[in-house]
Amino acid sequence: MIPRYSRKILKEIWEDNNKFQIWLDLEILACEAMEKLGQIPKGTSNRIKKKAKFKVKEIEKIEEKTKHDVIAFLTNVAKYVGAESRYIHKGLTSSDILDTSFSIQLNQSSNIILGGLEKLSKSLLRIAKKHKYTLCLSLIHISEPTRPTWI
Protein backbone atom coordinates (compact mmCIF):
# COMPACT_ATOMS: atom_id res chain seq x y z
CA MET A 1 0.00 0.00 0.00
CA ILE A 2 1.18 3.50 -0.74
CA PRO A 3 1.31 5.16 2.70
CA ARG A 4 0.11 8.63 1.68
CA TYR A 5 -2.98 7.16 0.00
CA SER A 6 -3.74 4.62 2.72
CA ARG A 7 -6.18 4.98 5.56
CA LYS A 8 -4.50 4.03 8.83
CA ILE A 9 -7.14 1.47 9.73
CA LEU A 10 -6.84 -0.29 6.35
CA LYS A 11 -3.05 -0.14 6.42
CA GLU A 12 -3.06 -1.90 9.81
CA ILE A 13 -5.15 -4.76 8.39
CA TRP A 14 -2.45 -5.49 5.79
CA GLU A 15 0.57 -5.09 8.07
CA ASP A 16 2.60 -8.16 9.01
CA ASN A 17 1.61 -7.99 12.67
CA ASN A 18 -2.09 -8.43 11.83
CA LYS A 19 -1.33 -11.12 9.24
CA PHE A 20 0.73 -13.13 11.72
CA GLN A 21 -1.87 -12.67 14.46
CA ILE A 22 -4.49 -14.14 12.12
CA TRP A 23 -2.13 -17.03 11.34
CA LEU A 24 -1.66 -17.66 15.06
CA ASP A 25 -5.40 -17.50 15.70
CA LEU A 26 -6.01 -20.01 12.89
CA GLU A 27 -3.34 -22.38 14.20
CA ILE A 28 -4.86 -22.23 17.69
CA LEU A 29 -8.35 -22.84 16.30
CA ALA A 30 -7.01 -25.87 14.43
CA CYS A 31 -5.46 -27.19 17.67
CA GLU A 32 -8.77 -26.70 19.49
CA ALA A 33 -10.59 -28.64 16.76
CA MET A 34 -8.03 -31.46 16.83
CA GLU A 35 -8.35 -31.63 20.60
CA LYS A 36 -12.15 -31.98 20.35
CA LEU A 37 -11.63 -34.77 17.81
CA GLY A 38 -9.20 -36.52 20.15
CA GLN A 39 -6.26 -36.07 17.77
CA ILE A 40 -4.14 -34.25 20.33
CA PRO A 41 -4.09 -34.56 24.15
CA LYS A 42 -6.71 -32.71 26.19
CA GLY A 43 -5.60 -29.32 27.50
CA THR A 44 -2.97 -28.92 24.81
CA SER A 45 -4.71 -26.11 22.94
CA ASN A 46 -5.11 -24.05 26.14
CA ARG A 47 -1.44 -24.45 27.01
CA ILE A 48 -0.47 -23.51 23.46
CA LYS A 49 -2.79 -20.48 23.54
CA LYS A 50 -1.23 -19.23 26.80
CA LYS A 51 2.35 -19.50 25.53
CA ALA A 52 1.90 -18.69 21.84
CA LYS A 53 3.30 -15.43 20.56
CA PHE A 54 5.55 -14.17 17.79
CA LYS A 55 7.90 -11.35 16.92
CA VAL A 56 7.74 -9.92 13.41
CA LYS A 57 11.44 -8.98 13.27
CA GLU A 58 12.47 -12.50 14.29
CA ILE A 59 10.17 -14.03 11.67
CA GLU A 60 11.74 -11.79 9.01
CA LYS A 61 15.24 -12.94 10.02
CA ILE A 62 14.23 -16.60 9.95
CA GLU A 63 12.56 -16.16 6.57
CA GLU A 64 15.80 -14.80 5.10
CA LYS A 65 17.30 -18.23 5.80
CA THR A 66 14.32 -20.51 5.12
CA LYS A 67 12.85 -18.59 2.15
CA HIS A 68 9.44 -19.72 3.42
CA ASP A 69 7.13 -17.39 5.32
CA VAL A 70 5.01 -20.02 7.06
CA ILE A 71 8.01 -22.08 8.18
CA ALA A 72 9.62 -18.91 9.52
CA PHE A 73 6.43 -18.08 11.42
CA LEU A 74 6.05 -21.60 12.85
CA THR A 75 9.71 -21.67 13.88
CA ASN A 76 9.30 -18.41 15.76
CA VAL A 77 6.07 -19.50 17.48
CA ALA A 78 7.68 -22.84 18.45
CA LYS A 79 10.39 -20.91 20.29
CA TYR A 80 7.75 -19.60 22.71
CA VAL A 81 5.45 -22.63 22.88
CA GLY A 82 8.10 -25.28 23.43
CA ALA A 83 7.59 -29.04 23.00
CA GLU A 84 3.84 -28.80 22.41
CA SER A 85 4.51 -26.79 19.27
CA ARG A 86 4.66 -30.15 17.50
CA TYR A 87 0.85 -30.03 17.46
CA ILE A 88 0.75 -26.64 15.75
CA HIS A 89 0.14 -26.85 12.00
CA LYS A 90 -0.49 -30.61 12.29
CA GLY A 91 -2.42 -31.77 9.21
CA LEU A 92 -2.41 -28.31 7.64
CA THR A 93 -0.72 -26.92 4.57
CA SER A 94 0.73 -23.46 4.09
CA SER A 95 -2.13 -22.72 1.71
CA ASP A 96 -4.68 -23.57 4.40
CA ILE A 97 -3.26 -20.77 6.52
CA LEU A 98 -2.40 -18.30 3.74
CA ASP A 99 -5.69 -18.54 1.85
CA THR A 100 -7.81 -18.41 4.98
CA SER A 101 -5.93 -15.47 6.47
CA PHE A 102 -6.09 -13.61 3.15
CA SER A 103 -9.86 -14.05 3.06
CA ILE A 104 -10.09 -12.79 6.66
CA GLN A 105 -8.05 -9.71 5.75
CA LEU A 106 -10.26 -9.11 2.72
CA ASN A 107 -13.31 -9.39 4.96
CA GLN A 108 -11.84 -6.97 7.50
CA SER A 109 -11.05 -4.48 4.72
CA SER A 110 -14.46 -4.89 3.09
CA ASN A 111 -16.22 -4.11 6.36
CA ILE A 112 -14.28 -0.84 6.67
CA ILE A 113 -14.87 0.10 3.03
CA LEU A 114 -18.58 -0.72 3.20
CA GLY A 115 -18.91 1.42 6.32
CA GLY A 116 -17.28 4.30 4.46
CA LEU A 117 -19.54 3.82 1.45
CA GLU A 118 -22.58 3.92 3.71
CA LYS A 119 -21.43 7.26 5.16
CA LEU A 120 -20.71 8.57 1.65
CA SER A 121 -24.12 7.59 0.32
CA LYS A 122 -25.85 9.29 3.28
CA SER A 123 -23.83 12.46 2.66
CA LEU A 124 -24.63 12.45 -1.05
CA LEU A 125 -28.32 11.95 -0.34
CA ARG A 126 -28.29 14.81 2.16
CA ILE A 127 -26.56 17.14 -0.35
CA ALA A 128 -28.89 16.06 -3.16
CA LYS A 129 -31.98 16.79 -1.04
CA LYS A 130 -30.56 20.12 0.12
CA HIS A 131 -29.86 21.27 -3.44
CA LYS A 132 -32.84 19.64 -5.14
CA TYR A 133 -34.20 23.03 -6.22
CA THR A 134 -30.95 24.99 -6.35
CA LEU A 135 -30.54 26.77 -9.67
CA CYS A 136 -27.18 26.40 -11.26
CA LEU A 137 -26.27 28.13 -14.51
CA SER A 138 -23.07 27.74 -16.42
CA LEU A 139 -21.75 28.85 -19.79
CA ILE A 140 -19.02 26.96 -21.53
CA HIS A 141 -17.42 28.56 -24.60
CA ILE A 142 -20.46 30.78 -25.09
CA SER A 143 -22.79 27.83 -25.64
CA GLU A 144 -26.18 27.30 -24.05
CA PRO A 145 -26.33 26.64 -20.34
CA THR A 146 -25.74 23.11 -19.18
CA ARG A 147 -26.23 21.68 -15.76
CA PRO A 148 -22.88 20.87 -14.15
CA THR A 149 -22.27 17.98 -11.82
CA TRP A 150 -22.27 18.85 -8.16
CA ILE A 151 -19.38 17.96 -5.83
PLM segments and residue spans:
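A helix-coil-helix interface module used to build multimeric assemblies
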Residues: 1-139, 143, 147
